[in-house]
């Protein structure tokens, strides 16, 4: 068994937008639209910051996350054709 820890797509995405402070729009399952920047996250929730205010959003309530700009999650390899 490998000791190397693999990161899932959700954590990779959230960590990338957190580090780059990319503005997001988060849609909840009830239709509410939230906007802000991810300042922290764990397995169960996301801390969203906007205008000096923080909102703790539970992941089970999130439907969709839309970044305001494209997010590059990995370095494209030289052998890929785009």
UniProtKB/Swiss-Prot annotation:
Repeat found in the keyword field: no
GO annotation, biological process: regulation of DNA-templated transcription; regulation of RNA stability; regulation of translation, ncRNA-mediated
Extent of the signal sequence: none
Domain of life, source organism: Bacteria
GO MF annotation list: RNA binding
A cellular-component GO term for this protein: cytosol
ATP-binding is among the record's keywords: no
Keywords: RNA-binding, Stress response
Domain Sm: 11-71
Name of one Pfam family that matches: Hfq
SUPFAM superfamilies registered for this protein in UniProt: Sm-like ribonucleoproteins (SSF50182)
Family: Belongs to the Hfq family.
Role according to the record: RNA chaperone that binds small regulatory RNA (sRNAs) and mRNAs to facilitate mRNA translational regulation in response to envelope stress, environmental stress and changes in metabolite concentrations. Also binds with high specificity to tRNAs.
Subunit structure and binding partners: Homohexamer.
Protein name (database record): RNA-binding protein Hfq
Gene name of the encoded protein: hfq
